[in-house]
From Swiss-Prot:
One of its GO terms (biological process) is gluconeogenesis. Mg(2+) binds at residues 213, 217, 373. Belongs to the phosphoglycerate kinase family. This is Phosphoglycerate kinase.
Length: 415
């Protein structure tokens, strides 16, 4: 899939109605936004469109999971207040995203007006399926989805997409707005630029760090990475499946993925055939339970982890070796932490890896830190500005790394 798409910087926005898909799926508590990071992320694109003389900007987003009907707690109205504060100008909230009330609400607007539509997922047509007010599963017909998409399209002259986090979803607002110019906002453009560097033009040695609980969750990712990388670190809970399968290691109460174990030998043979060097942990920090107050211990591959304990982090020898591997890489993809970094007793391995990636970044190494847990590591240690890129889309970034086609990107105009 080509990642070179039309950028907002190459679109004439003067006197145009700009229809912009954003990701304002923000955390809420008691009707208030508790984290504005995603709103802040979209603001450069919104401000740029205003500066370039856009007639109006129509913002559309989802909030919450699959809905299919109007649910008060998922209203985007409180988000509009935060957007207004950030822009320093009024943002008119519209109580629906399509229909006569929406179009009438935009009439007689002054130049540079900003509108925020109500939650797209209040309409079952956005995702194609949802839940009725009485709790029954419902589906939209293709004709209904098409009509919904066309009604959204009528609200703009130019379509911008800055919602990388939903780029892997073939939802109406992502793929159905068939305006002549369909461009990336700055946030989307940044994501695509970094992934293009990583996947199409990587500098070598190219290293992938892949963690997570289950091997079976990362099958497609590992398979695709083996075609691209020079070295691969297998870490986190999934490492125990490799170690038990390959070395008959005693892993105690550690995670073991039986379905994933069935393909470990095949992967090792594939890696060997492609001259990819695989690195696995050699020692561990263990705990007698999955809890902050666990009694800790240490273990090595031989004699293994005792029956009462589980491996919850990489040990010092492991991290010394992994950091050496990181230090010689020129391109790094990191998807999955070294251990249970949310618990301080088991955060040392991930922190050591983060420090090594930060050090590599200062030397010009391109790196992408994606996956929900890995992306969370950066705010924990305040390293967002010290690494090349922290992806804003967990599912979207994983599917790109897996080599999949993303509907929301395919729908954009080519550069």
């Amino acid at each position: 899939m080509g990642l070179r798409k039309l950028s907002i910087a190459n679109v004439d926005l003067k006197d145009k109605r700009v229809l912009m898909r954003v990701d304002f799926n923000v955390p809420m508590k008691d009707g208030k936004v508790t984290n504005t990071q995603r709103i802040v992320g979209a603001s450069p694109t919104i401000k740029y469109a205003l500066d370039k003389g856009a007639k109006s900007i129509v913002l559309m987003s989802h909030l919450g999971g699959r809905v299919g009907n109007k649910v008060a707690r998922y209203s985007l109205n409180p988000v509009g207040e935060e957007v207004s504060k950030l822009l320093g100008k009024p943002v008119k909230f519209l109580p629906d995203c399509v229909g006569p009330e929406t179009t009438e609400g935009m009439c007689q607007s002054s130049a540079g007006s900003v509108f925020l539509l109500e939650n797209l997922r209040f309409h079952v047509e956005e995702e194609g399926k949802g839940v009725s007010p009485t709790g029954e599963k419902i589906k939209a017909t293709p004709e209904q989805v098409k009509a919904f998409s066309e009604n959204l399209t009528k609200l703009g002259d130019v379509y911008l997409n800055d919602a990388f986090g939903t780029a892997h979803r073939a939802h109406a607002s992502m793929v159905g707005c068939r305006l002549t110019q369909r461009a990336c906002g700055f946030l989307m453009d940044k994501e695509l630029t970094y992934f293009s560097k990583l996947l199409d033009q990587p500098q070598h040695p190219f290293l992938a760090i892949i963690g997570g609980a289950k091997v079976s969750d990362k099958i497609q990712l590992i398979k695709n990475m083996l075609d691209k990388v020079d070295e691969l670190i297998i870490t986190g809970g999934m490492a125990f499946t490799f170690l038990k399968k390959l070395h008959n290691m005693k892993i105690g109460k550690s995670l073991y993925d039986e379905p994933g174990a069935a393909i470990v030998d095949e992967w090792m043979q594939l890696a060997k055939s492609k001259n990819v060097k695989i690195h696995l942990p050699v020692d561990f920090i263990t705990g007698d339970k999955f809890a902050e107050d666990a009694n800790t211990g240490t273990a090595t591959v031989e004699p293994g982890i005792r029956d009462t304990h589980m491996g919850l982090d990489g040990g010092p020898k492991t991290m010394e070796e992994f950091c050496k591997v990181i230090s010689r890489a020129k391109t790094i993809v990191w998807n999955g932490p070294m251990g249970v970094f949310e618990m301080e007793k088991f955060a040392g391995g991930t922190k050591a890896a983060m420090d090594a990636v930060v050090a590599a970044t200062t030397k010009g190494v391109t790196n992408n830190n994606g996956g929900g847990d890995t992306a969370t590591c950066c705010p924990k240690w305040k390293t967002e500005a010290q690494v090349s890129h922290v992806s804003t889309g967990v599912g979207a970034s994983l599917e790109l790394l897996e080599g999949k086609q993303l509907p929301g990107i395919l729908a954009l105009s080519d550069a």
